[in-house]
């Protein structure tokens, strides 16, 4: 079974208690939810926009009957979901942001530049209509360049966008392998650098397709209103754009003058929490993870 990143650190901060209600806003394979349910006699409401995660929910239902509840949805709808379940307040909300290992490893989902598959990148095929193929084949060259630069921090964004525009004139770009080849034709891999040249471009397009940063902002805004006093919001993020949003929004909530919530918060960890050396050795994907948490006063 896959162990989610910073699991022990998340549990130490959340400190699940009997009789409390928690939300796993990014259910995935259910690692956080399972750990919370094993820690206390509590309830967990799990949310994930990926329909494929339902199979993991079914396993948890058998292990924890009546304790776990699941909804296929974007977590930006967290307020509507909980109110629909007759819940006004909860005691903790956890987020593990970004693409999951199982999504990356499934070539048919179109997230990976190392496995050829349809150029999709949607975390939900039923909720989202525009996939990565539509974007790269129909967006203006300037828009593609801006997305790759803004969301990927790619300094060769204009060269990549130009190469994409030239390639699609000949035939539509339909697979991850085709897109990765186009990017690699523009950027040569450095001998001293292990990161694939296509990494930043794929990250940027994925973020745009799924509106990930907008989702994160809305998720935090609504979560702040849903917590009981003593409740906690915990966010694990994997790149600087996400972490910057979390840091700024948490600072605003804790400043005492936030327009998001009139009730005060305080930082649980003033310094960002990172994975241990041992965890990085066991799971290299965790190397960029950062955990931030706040407490509702």
Curated annotation (Swiss-Prot):
GO terms for biological process: rRNA base methylation. It is found in: Cytoplasm. S-adenosyl-L-methionine binds at residues 30-32, 48, 75, 96, 103. Keywords: Cytoplasm, Methyltransferase, rRNA processing, S-adenosyl-L-methionine, Transferase. Belongs to the methyltransferase superfamily. RsmH family. NCBIfam families: 16S rRNA (cytosine(1402)-N(4))-methyltransferase RsmH. This is Ribosomal RNA small subunit methyltransferase H.
């Amino acid at each position: 079974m896959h162990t989610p990143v910073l699991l022990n650190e998340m549990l130490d901060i959340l400190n699940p208690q009997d009789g409390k209600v928690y939300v796993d806003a990014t259910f995935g394979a259910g690692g956080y939810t399972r750990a919370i349910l094993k820690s206390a006699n509590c309830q967990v409401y799990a949310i994930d926009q990926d329909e494929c995660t339902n199979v993991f929910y079914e396993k948890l239902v058998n292990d924890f009957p009546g304790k776990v509840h699941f909804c296929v949805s974007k977590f930006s709808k967290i307020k509507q979901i909980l109110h629909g379940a007759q819940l006004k307040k909860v005691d903790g909300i956890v987020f593990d942001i970004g693409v999951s290992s199982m999504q990356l490893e499934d070539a048919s989902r179109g997230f990976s530049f190392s496995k050829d598959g349809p150029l999709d990148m949607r975390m939900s095929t039923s909720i989202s209509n525009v996939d990565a193929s539509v974007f790269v084949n129909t967006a203006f060259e300037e828009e593609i360049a801006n997305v790759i630069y803004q969301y990927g921090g790619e300094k060769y964004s204009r060269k990549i966008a130009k190469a994409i525009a030239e390639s699609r004139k000949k035939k539509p770009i339909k697979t991850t392998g085709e897109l990765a080849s186009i990017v690699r034709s523009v950027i040569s891999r450095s001998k001293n650098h292990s990161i694939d040249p296509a990494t930043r471009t794929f990250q940027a397009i994925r973020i745009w397709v799924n509106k990930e940063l907008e989702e994160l902002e809305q998720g935090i805004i609504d979560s702040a209103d849903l917590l009981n006093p003593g409740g906690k919001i915990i966010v694990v993020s994997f790149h600087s754009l996400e972490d910057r949003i979390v840091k700024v929004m948490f600072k605003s909530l804790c400043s005492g003058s936030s327009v998001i919530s009139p009730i005060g918060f305080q930082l649980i960890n003033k310094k960002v929490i990172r994975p241990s050396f041992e965890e990085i050795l066991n799971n290299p994907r965790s190397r960029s993870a950062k955990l931030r948490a706040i407490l509702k006063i």
